[in-house]
């Protein structure tokens, strides 16, 4: 049986890892073992942050919608409640885009939400 030499494959593998780790500081960009460990951690961070990004954007959209709806005299909660009552199916991403880019259209949506909201007949809340 022929002898298998693995030097070429080993060097190629190590070179690829070190190239991927080229932007890291210190030993993490120069030593193979440290670079490999850091690459494994970085893959985990990337995976987790791709999922975290979705929540981050949702929070940003809600903040933008809340600010714009308060400027039009309605809180975020009541605005969303009014849109659901009016059966308007616009997602938060589009609402946030309207709030930033087209204030007149957003104001029209706020008016639709206000019209669809039931009148609050309960007694006003008092601090207990």
From Swiss-Prot:
Highest taxon of source: Bacteria
Q: Which Pfam families match?
A: Ribosomal_L20
Family, similarity comment: Belongs to the bacterial ribosomal protein bL20 family.
Q: Which GO terms describe its cellular component?
A: ribonucleoprotein complex; ribosome
Q: Which UniProt keywords apply?
A: Ribonucleoprotein, Ribosomal protein, RNA-binding, rRNA-binding
Matching CDD domains:
Ribosomal_L20 (cd07026)
HAMAP family under this entry?
Answer: Ribosomal_bL20
The entry's function note states:
Binds directly to 23S ribosomal RNA and is necessary for the in vitro assembly process of the 50S ribosomal subunit. It is not involved in the protein synthesizing functions of that subunit.
Q: Which organism is it from?
A: Kocuria rhizophila (strain ATCC 9341 / DSM 348 / NBRC 103217 / DC2201)
Q: Does the keyword Ribonucleoprotein apply?
A: yes
InterPro entries reported for this sequence: Ribosomal_bL20, RIBOSOMAL_L20_CS, Ribosomal_protein_bL20_C
Taxonomic lineage: Bacteria, Bacillati, Actinomycetota, Actinomycetes, Micrococcales
Q: What is this protein called?
A: Large ribosomal subunit protein bL20
> What is one GO biological process annotated to this record?
ribosomal large subunit assembly
Q: Which molecular function terms from Gene Ontology are attached?
A: rRNA binding; structural constituent of ribosome
